[in-house]
Amino acid sequence: MQHNSLIARFAQGNLVLQILVGIILGISLALVSPSSAESVGMLGSLFVGALKAIAPILVFILVAASIANQKKNQHTHMRPIIAMYLAGTFFAALTAVVLSFMFPTTLTLVTGAEGANPPQGILEVIKTLLFKLVDNPVNALMSANYIGILAWGVGLGLALHHASDTTKAVFEDLSHSVSHIVRFIIRLAPFGIFGLVASTFATTGFDALAGYAHLLVVLLSAMAIIALIVNPAMVYVKTKQNPYPLVFQCLRESGVTAFFTRSSAANIPVNMALCEKLKLDEDTYSVSIPLGATINMAGAAITITTLTLAAVHTMGIEVDLMTAILLSVVAAVSACGASGVAGGSLLLIPLACGLFGISNDIAMQVVAVGFIIGVIQDSAETALNSSTDVVFTAAVCESEAQKAKG
């Protein structure tokens, strides 16, 4: 009986507080017994694995169900959300340019990242994304190709729009069932994050990062400015309300989990659950959240811009204002295609370096620096990208609700 009440108390407890306890315990275990900390890393791997496993089917079913059950003349308001995604990504690149010029970074270059194949140009990134769009639906689900999953989900939803009410009800019930499984997995987050934190501290330590402290400060400052100044300003313009309660809730409930899972895909179920908690329109967020995980890449734009300009400063290349603005545009467009590149934002650095005539050898050494600081850079980048998906979706939903009230 006591056993059951303990489980019930855990299930009804404050998830954010439980995650905080998991973080503290993980750090403590890594300091006291690194070998034990490495072994509990399996808990983290299991948690991330479960999220990654459920995310593709969740997106596919939710998108198909929401479009199939959409009432006539009902709008999903995707256009303003996509506009905010793209504008936010460009502002992120611009912020990184300004900070990189105010506090120029020079790098001690290391040997190149072995076995990495950066794209040859922006056309290759676009080509990869287009082929992902027409991927086999089964393969898209198996390989977590969210561009393909969205395309097939939308296609099936539109086809089912004219199906019988019974068929639509089956899809609606399926989406509720998958959401229940997601809620169960998210309740296990404290254990997963405990394992992730313990193993990260035990295996990496932070000695390796000390030499790149200046670069990390510039990167993290740019991300903080976007999360705490630019995003709230964009939300205020859209809703004319105090944006900070929403921003802090999204950082707390989406950003923290994303920081430790380091995967936008794994954080899709967490974001979906948060949107449900915020009582947003399901027809809107079931499409905008997986789409955001694919194209809303403010963190990636900051990483590409900052590391490219660090390479520029290291090589002693002079950069004029127009080239810096062009870099912002290239970084923003490249970042939106980061999901179309194995290795994500780091492997798009050579593409941006090409603007300044920096050789591929030097660019790959900069990528290697990115991998060294990745434990912090990738975590912060994912936290910013993923939490911003909910911030912008909620802002547009709130704005449209205000318009509807008149």
Swiss-Prot record:
This is Serine/threonine transporter SstT. The chain crosses the membrane at residues 15-35, 47-67, 81-101, 140-160, 191-211, 215-235, 289-309, 315-335, 362-382. GO terms for molecular function: neutral L-amino acid:sodium symporter activity. It is found in: Cell inner membrane. Belongs to the dicarboxylate/amino acid:cation symporter (DAACS) (TC 2.A.23) family. Involved in the import of serine and threonine into the cell, with the concomitant import of sodium (symport system). SUPFAM superfamilies: Proton glutamate symport protein (SSF118215). Keywords: Amino-acid transport, Cell inner membrane, Cell membrane, Membrane, Symport, Transmembrane, Transmembrane helix, Transport.
